[in-house]
């Protein structure tokens, strides 16, 4: 089923295939034994931040002006790339989008567009520029790195003393497309070099290398990275006190907006009454909200965070209906009602399914109404289809389970890319961008079909990889790891390696697609979609037993409840 909240609890196995519900409902339904929420409604509503006053806004504006002056003074030199990188990693580049856009355009035409200019750039800035320019949609070919190896295919000896250079080349290599062998070699060589260098380095460079080897920057969640990088950058030689102060202040001011979004979502959750009327429903409003910060932490995405939290909660609840509580007969009826989207059809459903359908029906209609009021177009047909597709995919998994069918890995993944819930979540995201015409959004939906598929595939594989073997043994459906073992006779470590390889290959396809679908109206959506992948890889780890509730709780406290500058 769905991945959003799998890691917070372990489900019991599904009810048996021959379980039926008669008029007296003699079948005893299993509870999934979920833990109660760590945060009560009253606690969430009591949260507040002092970083909302006019004084903070005024100070932030003064600091922004100072940074704009820094950017102007840096000119169009290649060194300016380091400033752009710092602004991005500190989480404040969104405040200087126009300045950064102009800078990168000038630097691209001066140094990167024409091969005859490449020899003016040292490897460090080649790698940094390559990463930033590809990230921003510029075409920079892999051949820019042709001479980083000697004729024996080893690293050129003059590179062997510069860890920062190797680190930048390592990070650049994760922006590769399929069949870019120069970048593949760069990744292999730099990974080996950086691992070996750990014994010889210390301080902030040691922290940076360890961090990068755990996960490359391109795969990291921007908000989580900002929290980490602010603390690292503050201790760095030559750091800018202006950047540090602005990054901290902005982090705390934006966190205050997130708190209001969370409180809004929490009130909505209470109003659904699902936590009291649906005994199996999980109260995971805070954890679900954390996902939305992964989509976008920016202040102007408030409506998006509030909407996506509702979507994630509804996905989690439907997942429990299909995975834990419903009999196969009930699930087939329920899927039919969702497909018809007809309130009159709910008479045939058991009471808990009526409550579930009515909650979904009302919430989707409310979202539709809000979009109609704000943007002037009707999105219900798009949303109805996305939710029906999700429920059909859930039903397929339930049918496989009840019939004892073991799908092939490809058969599983075709369905699991839908049941992971990426397509339904991203369909909602299409209508939360700043694009204001339904024609443009329709074009964007068509243009980004491959992106949605690749994002959903990595989302699914990351979820499966994050399922430890113990959890799989307790769980109710086969995952891609087990299916690969079943098909090929591979061991569990071999199967995990294969899934990681698939994730790597799919990232390359996603990178290519991001570069190809380079229209302004799609860019915002593409960034949100890529952030969903990053959030999935962040939330699921790689099957570590300890990656559970306590880890997530610490992230919630760090990102949502604790200001950097203190309370």
Curated annotation (Swiss-Prot):
Its cofactor is Mg(2+). A motif (DDXXD motif) lies at residues 319-323. It is found in: Plastid, Chloroplast. Its EC number is 4.2.3.26. The keyword Isomerase does not apply. Residues 1-24 form a transit peptide. Pathway: Secondary metabolite biosynthesis; terpenoid biosynthesis. (2E)-geranyl diphosphate binds at residues 282, 319, 323, 460, 463. The keyword Magnesium applies. GO terms for cellular component: chloroplast. Mg(2+) 1 binds at residues 319, 323. Binds 3 Mg(2+) ions per subunit. PANTHER family: OS04G0344100 PROTEIN-RELATED (PTHR31225), TERPENE SYNTHASE 10 (PTHR31225:SF9). Monoterpene synthase that catalyzes the formation of (3R)-linalool from geranyl diphosphate, but not from isopentenyl diphosphate, dimethylallyl diphosphate, chrysanthemyl diphosphate, farnesyl diphosphate, (+)-copalyl diphosphate or geranylgeranyl diphosphate. This is R-linalool synthase QH1, chloroplastic. It comes from Artemisia annua. The lineage of its organism: Eukaryota, Viridiplantae, Streptophyta, Embryophyta, Tracheophyta.
């Amino acid at each position: 089923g769905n991945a959003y909240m799998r890691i917070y609890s372990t489900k019991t196995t599904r009810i048996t295939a021959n379980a039926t519900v008669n008029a007296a409902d003699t079948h005893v339904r299993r509870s999934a034994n979920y833990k109660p929420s760590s945060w009560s409604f009253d606690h969430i509503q009591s949260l507040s931040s002092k970083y909302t006053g006019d004084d903070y806004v005024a100070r932030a504006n003064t600091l922004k002006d100072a940074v704009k002056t820094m950017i102007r003074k840096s000119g169009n030199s290649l060194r300016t790339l380091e400033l752009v990188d710092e602004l991005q990693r500190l989480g404040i580049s969104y405040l200087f989008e126009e300045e950064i856009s102009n800078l990168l355009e000038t630097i691209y035409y001066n140094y990167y567009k024409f091969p005859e200019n490449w020899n003016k750039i040292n490897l460090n800035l080649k790698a940094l520029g390559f990463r930033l320019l590809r990230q921003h949609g510029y075409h920079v070919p892999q051949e820019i790195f042709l001479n980083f190896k000697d004729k024996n295919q080893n690293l050129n000896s003059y590179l062997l003393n510069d860890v920062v250079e190797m680190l930048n080349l390592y990070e650049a290599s994760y922006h590769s497309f399929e069949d870019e062998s120069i970048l593949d070699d760069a990744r292999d060589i730099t990974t080996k070099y950086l691992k070996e260098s750990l014994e010889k380095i210390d301080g902030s460079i040691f922290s940076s290398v360890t961090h990068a080897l755990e996960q490359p920057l391109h795969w990291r969640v921007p908000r989580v990275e900002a929290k980490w990088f602010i603390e690292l950058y503050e201790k760095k030689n030559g750091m800018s006190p202006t950047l540090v102060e602005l990054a901290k202040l902005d982090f705390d001011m934006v966190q205050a907006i997130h708190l209001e979004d969370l409180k809004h979502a929490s009130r909505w959750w209470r109003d659904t009454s699902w936590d009291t009327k649906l005994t199996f429903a999980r109260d995971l409003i805070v954890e679900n909200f954390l996902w939305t910060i992964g989509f976008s932490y920016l202040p102007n995405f408030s409506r998006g965070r509030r909407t996506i939290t509702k979507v994630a909660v509804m996905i989690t609840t439907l997942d429990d209906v299909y995975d834990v509580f419903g009999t196969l007969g009930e699930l087939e009826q329920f899927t039919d009602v969702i497909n018809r989207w007809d309130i009159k059809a709910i008479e045939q459903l058991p009471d808990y399914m009526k409550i579930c359908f009515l909650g979904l029906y009302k919430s989707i209609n409310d979202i539709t109404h809000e979009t109609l009021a704000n943007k002037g177009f009707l999105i219900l047909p798009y949303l109805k289809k996305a939710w029906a597709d999700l429920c059909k995919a859930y039903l397929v998994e339930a049918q496989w389970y009840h019939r004892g069918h073991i799908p092939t890995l490809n058969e599983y993944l075709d369905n699991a890319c839908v049941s992971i819930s990426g397509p339904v979540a991203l369909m909602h995201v299409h209508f939360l961008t700043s694009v204001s015409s339904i024609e443009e959004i329709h074009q964007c939906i068509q243009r980004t079909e491959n992106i949605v598929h690749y994002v959903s595939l990595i989302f699914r594989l990351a979820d499966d990889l994050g399922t430890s073997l113990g959890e799989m043994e307790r769980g109710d459906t086969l995952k891609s790891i087990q299916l690969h073992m079943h098909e090929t006779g591979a061991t569990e470590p071999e199967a995990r390696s294969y899934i990681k390889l698939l994730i790597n290959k799919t990232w390359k396809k996603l990178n290519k697609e991001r570069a190809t679908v380079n229209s302004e109206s799609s860019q915002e959506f593409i960034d949100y979609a890529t952030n969903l992948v990053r959030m999935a890889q962040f939330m699921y780890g790689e099957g570590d037993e300890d990656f559970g509730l306590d880890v997530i709780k610490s992230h919630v406290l760090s990102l949502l409840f604790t200001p950097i500058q203190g309370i």
